[in-house]
A protein has these predicted regions:
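Surface-exposed, glycine-biased beta-strand/turn segments
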Residues: 1-88, 93-101, 129-130, 137-139, ...
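Cell-wall glycan-active module
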Residues: 1-34, 103, 119-120, 150-515, ...
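Extracytoplasmic
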Residues: 42-44, 58, 87, 107, ...
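Conserved positions in beta-strands of structured domains
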Residues: 62-64, 113-116
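Acidic, glycine-anchored pre-beta loop/turn
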Residues: 119-128
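Active-site loop architecture of trypsin-fold serine endopeptidases
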Residues: 137-147, 151
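Substrate-binding/active-site groove segments that recognize
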Residues: 464-468, 472-473, 561-580
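Substrate-binding clefts and substrate-entry loops adjacent to catalytic sites
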Residues: 574-600, 618-637, 648
Length: 685
């Protein structure tokens, strides 16, 4: 899922992404979410702007309803009710993916109301792509602003949040088909907290112990090499509020904790490093079809804050529950609100009216869509009766004026069912899903460059990579003319699972990864190193390359040719990957035909690439000795930036000779980076 705000301006260095989203969406406090100042439901927010501000599409989607503005009408009734008001709008339906399987496929809608003008490309049935212009901000009640909202139906609220209940179910772990963002842990009262880490990651801990007296909620997040642990507890009086315990702990259990997850997995989980990597990354094993933790109850010891001070806890203990941002944990503010049973526009929700929290932006509220002309009269009927909002009830003529104004703004030929929908604060929805990082089919299509080479030849210009061909490549097995498998089936989901596991989830990291894959796989065409039999002689025992790769048996050159999303090459690398996956059988991938798995099995093909990415260390010569330079893993180098030199440095971690950098890797990176970032001016290529 790729998403951004409807207003786009440059990021500021060191600015948090959520802060940038809020800066892009300056909200009128009188027209906020989920209520306006008159205590009526308000399904979106009014974004303050100016008449020259371009409103942009937040994500790829299809235009399903539109109304052109009429400047001559906005100064007179019924549009001019409290001031000049524009009636132009665009309604977009977004179909995207946030995880694997059917539960990972979601539908939501975005509405851009009170537009002064609408871009000529915006037509019913047309597809709009993220960052494309929708139109220009107009006027609302005499103020420069436009209304913006995001909502979904009943079926999709369960897919999006994983539940229909107000709060997270604390009796079971969170979803495994939709996992993204931070990891969260529920520690019931009575959880043992120890004074020190046990030796060798032992399940037994003989250091002093005390037990928690109240439930605790721990969040584990990764960012640019750091791992941050935050503990919360429920407020003793304000039951709807969860307060932080102590200050966030950053890298309390090791320097550059995120970058070093691979080395920690080898150290702490010597019998199953790959599954151990998932424990460190997710707090649990997620890919259970291919990963098995040994022993099954291997612990996850982490330092956290408690009301009594810092302590060490086994977050892998049986009684502790594990979730991700994909479960919308209620202790981080997310709550489903569905307790206003009437059908009028007045907010009568006890949850909203009686809450003790000041911030309602993570309330997901179920109430009628305010733009349905068929329900306008019934939604505003309450204004004729005594109420707490108006000093006296509205007269029939006054109410008629309001109703005519509302009808003039309602959707034309409303394509949506006349029922309640689930409303999100659009700032929170966008900020939340910018942490998702899951690439669906259409996302992969967008991120892959149409042309392989920076300067394509005539043959490629006339036959660029088509959408249908790319879909076939990420779904179906591929074979060469000799019947040899060159590409596994089922790459789409397994690639996103691998990117998620190895924390290749930020736009910059994903762009660098796809830049490398463009050369390594020919844009998903072949996941095996190309060449005739004589080509691989340069990798044979006794050659310079063969010695570097640990090839010591005749035939190793072809036997251990490059395979995977990022090519695993050479006997030593195949053996090391085997040690990482299953140390009890470290020759698994060096034994034929298992050496073929990184090209025949989509999971191993993608996982081998992720393993290579996470385990790669740069070395330099210092005083005639090879010395590590920089942190472990390619993510460290990817985080450096998006310049030509940054991309070249990443490339040298994958291919020391930087093969194909200028012609393929760099233009592929530039393309992917533009698709994923928030710039509105594309690169020249």
């Amino acid at each position: 899922m790729i998403i951004s705000p409807p207003i786009l301006h440059a990021h500021i260095d060191t600015e948090k992404d959520s802060d940038w989203v809020n800066r892009m969406m300056s909200v009128d406090p009188e027209r906020n979410f989920p209520m306006n100042s008159g205590r009526s439901w308000h399904g979106g927010v009014h974004l303050n702007g100016n008449l020259s501000e371009t409103v942009r599409c937040i994500a790829d989607g299809k235009v399903i309803s539109i109304r052109q503005p009429e400047p001559a009408e906005n100064t007179v009734p019924p549009l001019n009710y409290n001031g000049v008001t524009d009636k132009g709008y665009v309604l977009i339906k977004h179909e995207t993916e946030i995880g694997s399987g059917e539960e990972g496929k979601i539908v939501y809608y975005s509405l851009y109301m009170h537009l002064r003008s609408i871009d000529s490309n915006v037509q019913p049935g047309n597809t709009l792509y993220r960052k494309e212009p929708v139109g220009a901000a107009g006027m609302v009640d005499g103020q420069n602003a436009f209304h913006f909202q995001i909502f979904c139906d009943d079926e999709n609220i369960q897919k999006i949040t994983g539940r229909i209940s107000p709060e997270t179910d604390l009796n079971k772990d969170g979803r495994t088909d939709v996992v993204y963002g931070d990891s969260h842990f529920y520690l019931p009262a009575g959880t043992p907290i120890y004074g020190d880490m046990p030796e060798e990651n032992s399940l037994a801990n003989n250091s002093p112990v005390q037990r928690t007296s109240v439930p605790l909620y721990v969040t584990m997040s990764f960012d640019k090499g750091n791992c941050t642990m935050v503990t919360r507890q429920q407020h003793e009086v304000l039951s709807d509020t969860y307060t932080e315990v102590g200050s966030p702990l950053i890298n309390a259990d090791g320097k550059d904790y995120e970058y070093n997850l691979y080395s920690y997995a080898l150290q702490l989980y010597p019998k199953s490093p790959s599954a151990g990597y998932e424990m460190l990354r997710f707090g649990r094993v997620v890919n259970t079809e291919y990963e098995e933790l040994v022993p099954a109850d291997a612990p996850l010891w982490r330092t956290i804050n408690t009301p009594q001070g810092k302590g060490v806890v086994n977050l892998g203990a049986r009684d502790i529950r594990v979730y991700s941002d994909g479960d919308f944990p209620h202790w981080t503010g997310w709550k489903l609100v569905n307790d206003d049973a009437d059908t009028n526009s007045q907010c009568n929700s006890p949850t909203i009216l009686c809450t003790t929290r000041n911030d309602l932006s993570r309330m997901i509220c179920h109430f009628p869509l305010e733009w349905d002309s068929a329900t306008v009269e019934s939604r505003f009927e309450w204004l004729k009766s005594p109420n707490d909002v108006l000093s006296k009830p509205m007269t029939e003529p006054d109410l008629d004026l309001l109703i005519e104004h509302c009808k003039a703004l309602c959707l034309v030929d409303n394509p949506l069912p006349a029922r309640r929908v689930w409303h999100f604060d659009p700032r929170q929805f966008i900020a939340h899903f910018r942490k998702c990082g899951w690439l669906g089919e259409n996302d992969i299509i967008s991120v892959v460059r149409r042309y392989q080479n920076a300067y394509p030849m005539t043959s490629e210009l006339t036959r660029p990579l088509s959408k249908d061909t790319l879909i076939e490549r990420i779904i179906s097995q591929g074979q060469n003319s000799s019947g040899e498998v060159i590409r596994p089936a089922g790459l789409k989901n397994e690639l996103s699972k691998s990117l998620r596991k190895y924390l290749i989830t930020t736009p910059l990291r994903i762009a660098h990864y796809f830049g490398q894959m463009a050369r390594e796989t020919g844009r998903f065409a072949s996941f095996i190193e190309n060449g005739d039999s004589s080509y691989f002689d340069m990798y044979e025992p006794g050659t310079e390359q063969g010695l570097k790769l640990g090839n010591n048996v005749v035939g190793d050159g072809a036997r251990f040719k490059g395979r995977g999303t990022i090519h695993l090459t050479g006997r030593e690398n195949y053996r090391n990957y085997g040690k990482y996956r299953n140390p009890s059988d470290d020759d698994f991938f060096t034994t034929e035909p298992n050496n073929q798995l990184p090209v025949e099995n989509a999971y191993f093909s993608c996982d081998a690439g992720g393993y290579f990415w996470a385990s790669k260390q740069k070395y330099i010569i210092v005083s005639h000795r090879l010395t590590p330079s920089g942190s472990l893993g390619v993510n460290y180098w990817a985080d450096k930036g998006c310049s030509l030199s940054d991309a070249r440095e990443v490339t040298r971690r994958i291919n020391p000779a930087a093969d194909g950098f200028d012609l393929v890797r760099w233009p592929a990176f530039e393309h992917s980076w533009y698709v994923l970032n928030d710039e509105i001016t594309p690169p020249l290529n």
